[in-house]
Structures are given as C-alpha cells and as structure tokens.
C-alpha cells in the first residue's frame, strides 16, 4: 500500500517517504548518524504548559500537492485524526499515543478529541499530554504521519496514478510493476537532491531481487537473506543498521507457566 497510515514494511516506508514530505525530515549529520531538520514546516515553537502538557506550533512553508493545490495545516489535522481513528485500523496508530486526547479517540471513535488543530491555513498545532523526547525525530518524520488530502478518488491507496502527494518526488509513470517518480519544478529543496528520477521496482521473489542486483539492473534492494550473502562474502560490505527486536511471552500458555523458565529466556 502507498497509504501512509497503513504502511508496515521498510519498502513501503521508503517509497512513501520519497513521495510525501512530513513536518520534519531526517538528514545525515556527516558522522554516520542523522539529524532533524525542517520539512513541510519551515519552523516550529514548543511551549511548556502549566498543566504539564506541551504545545508544538508548526508554521508550514508554501508547498503544493501534485495536483497544484496548496498544502495546508488542515491536511495534517485530517491525516493525524485519520491515523488515530480506530475505524481506520492503522497498525501505526500508537505513534500518536503522546498526543493529548489520543486515548479518548481510541475509546470513543470521536477524532475531534485529538488535540490537533489548524488555527490558520499555514499553522498546525499539536498538544502533547506529556513531554516526548522523540516527538520531532520519530513522530514528525514518520511515514505514517505524512499529510493526506481529505478529498481523494476512491481506492486512491491502491492506484499510484491517483495519489496526491507533496514530497520531493512525484509519480510520473506506473507501468509493469515499475513506479517512476521525478522531481517537480516547484519543490523547494531541489539543490540537495542527487537524482532527478527514481524508479521503484516491486519484486516479491527474493531470488529475483538478488539476480537483479548482481546484473546491475537495480542499485538497491531490501531483504537479502544471510544465506545469499554468505555465498559470496567478498561481494558484500556489511554495515550497521539500527533495529529493535522484541520478544513477547504469552504467560497464559501452559508451556511458559514457569517463572524460572521465563527468567532464563531473558
């Protein structure tokens, strides 16, 4: 899917992150890490409130959707309300858990309880129920919280040609499993883009992905197995990749009823 709220795989996130632009974006810090910088929001301000909440006020830059319409704060309000709405059934809804009103939305289905607003066309305001150190770096840069237009064609998520996007690249062609995206003339940060055209190939066959890479028919792939890498160790250069693995133990299962066993597993 190319619906920001519904993405779950790395490949989906990569494509969505090139087609859409969030409030903030990540760039290289020149030392192997990343830093947060302005994206669709040209600036922001953070206020600590007396009740312990925090309010972020984002001022949007002048950006256009791929159909020429202006990107507004209302587009972010709609996208974030839609993400939190239990009716959307997004697997990424918990990204907004720190936003005030999130739990009320989840229990009632009333998206108006989410503390996000657009007091002006270019002003997006978010109130957090408490401080969140990763709000800017992980929530405001995430694929799932990208802006979404409320008026879209039916089944737009499954039809790349119907997508209305605001990012650095816009879809120019969708043919035979290949999605071609080019940089629009109106994009504000063209000078930093190293490629004017990207071609995404959707290939579910792992062996075919490896073959395409070996033949230099693609520049980048996801999902190579350890077995494939071990076959030609001199071909690949390993690099670190940040990842968190979680093991959830069903304590109600008879086979895991022993506390000593669970402690041994940890």
Residue ranges of predicted features:
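Gly/Pro-rich hinge or "lid" segments in bacterial periplasmic/extracellular proteins
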Residues: 122, 128-197, 207
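Solvent-exposed, polar/charged alpha-helical surfaces in well-ordered, non-transmembrane soluble domains
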Residues: 17, 21, 42, 74-82, ...
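Short, solvent-exposed loop/turn elements at domain surfaces
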Residues: 1-6, 26, 31-36, 67, ...
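N-terminal lobe/hinge region of extracytoplasmic solute-binding protein
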Residues: 1-51, 164
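Sec-exported extracytoplasmic/periplasmic mature domains
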Residues: 24-28, 81-89, 131-133, 140, ...
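Surface-exposed binding/hinge segments that line
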Residues: 70, 75-77, 88-149
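Extracellular/periplasmic solute-recognition and catalytic clefts
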Residues: 172-180, 199-255, 264
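Aromatic- and charge-enriched surface segment that lines or borders ligand/interaction sites
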Residues: 42-95, 125, 255-257
